């Protein structure tokens, strides 16, 4: 089963009324209006959907959408 992390992030963000734009993956989450609590909520929902948990060291490195996508793609390898 292949999981498209970008699509899953967009789906969960939309369900939670978080406006995301995948056009520029390097924009910091803070600049998108996503505070640390919203980011953790989003991450936990993604973890629940795909059945994995990100290690703490990966969580601490997530600053933008690219980091978020890469973190999940890495644990799914």
UniProtKB/Swiss-Prot annotation:
Modified positions (O-(pantetheine 4'-phosphoryl)serine) are 36
Q: Which domain of life is it from?
A: Bacteria
> Which pathway does it operate in?
Lipid metabolism; fatty acid biosynthesis
What residue stretch is flagged as signal peptide?
none
- The set of disulfide-linked cysteines is none
| Boundaries of every Carrier domain copy | 1-76
After translation, the protein is modified as follows:
4'-phosphopantetheine is transferred from CoA to a specific serine of the apo-ACP-like protein.
One GO BP annotation of this record? fatty acid biosynthetic process
What are the alphabetically sorted keywords of the record? Answer: Fatty acid biosynthesis, Fatty acid metabolism, Lipid biosynthesis, Lipid metabolism, Phosphopantetheine, Phosphoprotein
**The UniProt record lists the keyword Lipid biosynthesis:** yes
Q: What is this protein called?
A: Acyl carrier protein homolog
The species this protein belongs to is Ureaplasma parvum serovar 3 (strain ATCC 700970)
